[in-house]
Amino acid sequence: MKKKLIIVICVLLAAALLAACGGAAPAATAQPTLSAPPESGDAPEEAQARVWQARFVPLEAAGLTAALQKGAARGDTLYYISGGVIADETPEGVEPDWPEQYWVYGPILVKASPEGESEVLPYTPERPESEPGVNSGVLFEQLCLDPDGSLWVLENRYRIDAESGESREERSLVKLREDGEVLTRLPLQTLGAFAEEAERSGGSYSLSVPGLASDGKGALCLAVHEYYAGGGNYRQSNRLCVLDAESGELKNTLELDGEIAALVRLGSGQLALASYRGSSPVFALVDTEKGDLTEVAAADDFLTGVVGAAGDTLCYGAGDGFYRLDMAAGETEKLFDWAACDVAHSESDSVCVLEDGRVVTTACRESAEGVRSELVVLAPTAASEVAERKVLQLAVMNLYPFTSEMISRFNRSQSEYRIEVTDYAQFNDYTSADPADWNAGLTRLQTELIAGKVPDLIDISLLPVSRLGEKGLLTDLLPYIDSDPELGREKLNMHVLEAFEQQGKLYQTVSNYYVMTTLGLSGAVGEHIGWSMGEFSGAMRRLQEQDSASTVFDVYTTRDDALTFLLYLQMEDYVDWSEGSCRFDSEAFKQLLSFVRSFPTAYDWGADVTAAELDPDLRMLAGQQLMKQCNLTCFEDVQANTAGLGGAPCTFVGYPTESGVGSMFAQVGNALAISAACPEKEAAWAFVRQFFLPAYQEQLMGGVFPTNLAVYEQMKTEAQSTSYQRNPDGSYALDAEGQRIEAERGSAYVAGTEVKLRAATAEEIALVEEIVAATDHVLSTDDSLKEILLSGAAPYFADQRSLDETVRQIQSRAAIYVSEQK
């Protein structure tokens, strides 16, 4: 049956990393010690001094091009799904037209031990017959262990029409012995409740199986998610399907209210389900015979790494912690924090619990040679056996996943130091009716810094870096960059870094960035980057002479929006934090307020308008809008932002400003600083330097610009190069003539129609580089000052106060605030 997938199956292998472990638990007879080290005073001294420690074991498994997924454990043996090159069928004497032309990709079953020994199990599913214009293959979607010693694998045989993109999927459950002998094959025909309707209507349809478990009593349970959209209708379903393990006959179906996180088998033989009620995780026991659930407990955070363990134990990750849940008693115990064990968030998904109570997860690193995998084996260890290390304290507001990985890498590489993190976002209360509580974490961090409680390392992405630098709380990173053998200023985009400097000193890492700017038709805004407030006023006057209802930006942009944004852009023009002075009574600020006054007070959301009347590109072409706000995050964004203008000449002119060009750089991710009080600055630099190196910046390449010039040149080359589509198994997708199909680079919407983007041209790259070279402002925020300006300007906007009186009162209030911050 043909159906269009709303979720492309090309991401099945990658998405599987984010799903929970669906393997069976050790046998019920094994009762390992799986508990947190006791608190002081709760146990004898020899039992108290134990902490969870991680051991990182390289896994030698050649040819893998996918991470280890869907882990399952029996005793101390581990099983995983992966994928890679299973054959090279290059004909003798034939020179391939491209690398990999004759390589054969396929799914792989990996057997491993906690010591890093591994082997590929000798089962290779039969490949679909080759058809011109059709890309086909086989995926392993799920793996579980049967109590009789065999393995169950969920196979998905896919077929994708190269021209139409239409797909066909045929799933089967295959029971295997470890020697590759197929014991049972059960074609699955009854999982999709919406499939026939989707075929009739031609709507978007997808089906996935996020869980598989054997109850050991002749039944298999599958967790099924189904999505259908067509004919103006949207439907989705989450359910458990219980099948007879001999015949594949559907025995029971249980509809669920929320999204499925995992389905696992406990050591006692019972099946357990982890799912969501709204955004709250809940755990329940599954009765496959009756087809019902018994809810046991709930959790507080998004789930990762759900796995069955001995007896009635279920283990799961939530937030940074890993927990054990007694499904019989409903009692939960925290075992450890991943970060405390030097394990990154991205490495806490495919989790297994061994018979002796050790916890195993996986990590992988992509390289030109393929995927390098390692096992992360965690176990309670006597504290006396753990080498003591000096601790560097890091304070952050929202720890980004890539930063978490850098912390993990640093801690693993160091024998003398380790980093411990306090994420102040944990103190935010988004359920409070008081908006101040939403930023309680940031307020707490600022209060502690003022009081002298300064950590060794600080994420200053939401902090006033200039003021902290002026107070002598931060360390200049430039001397460290200059003396670093792998860096030096010649290796970095110093123009961008200089924009982030304060009085010639760089207090923060700037790894990746993008440009915030504006775009207008050249006939309206001119042909040059940058303009003054006077030039803007003239352009707006000319536009309104043609249409008095024309606006500066889109109809949604209000006065408060415009004033806030321009304040962030021009903060340094009006405030000198080092002197504790400001000049909001200047002529330049008066012009800014006059400019902002031209914006509407609010947008009328009840207005009867069409989508075309709201489209900023169409409004600019019709002379109803002067320019639009846009971001340049990659070279292809020139196309994305100009596609709707029909080839009309346009200019990335920027916001009107009295100094420089009215575009600004925005930092991406955590911006790290070394405090002046840090006693181990060389060790702190050993961590911070990672954010300037390729290994970190390459992770975001293509999405935002890097400051490392080697990574930047690589990004520029790839933006102009042709890349090709891959099939779900990793092989190249081919057209009817057997040629590789060019990969999509994204798309832009023009008047509601999707337009595919192409490779960037040399002219587009030169334009981006011209804009970057002309930009010297940085996005700078201060919520307290913003409120002073917004409240002070409101009477002027409402014709209740003159412009001169308005700026006088704003200057008076702002001067007091700025002086207090010195």
Q: What function would you assign to each model-found segment?
A:
Residues 422-492, 618-621, 626-627, 643-645:
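Extracytoplasmic "Venus flytrap"/periplasmic binding protein-like
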Residues 468-478, 493-537, 556-579, 666-674, ...:
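Periplasmic solute-binding protein
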Residues 210, 226, 446-447, 455-456, ...:
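A structural signal for short loop-to-beta-strand junctions that line the ligand-binding cleft
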Residues 478-491, 572-594, 654-663, 799:
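Short, solvent-exposed loop/beta-turn-alpha elements that line the ligand-binding surface or hinge
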Residues 642-726:
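Extracytoplasmic/periplasmic substrate-recognition and gating elements
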Residues 22-102, 110-116, 143, 156-158, ...:
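Conserved N-terminal structural module of periplasmic/extracytoplasmic solute-binding proteins
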Residues 579-613, 639, 648-656:
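Glycine-centered hinge/linker elements that transmit conformational signals in sensory
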Residues 666, 729-814:
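C-terminal capping/gating helix-and-loop segments adjacent to ligand/active sites or protein-protein/ligand interfaces
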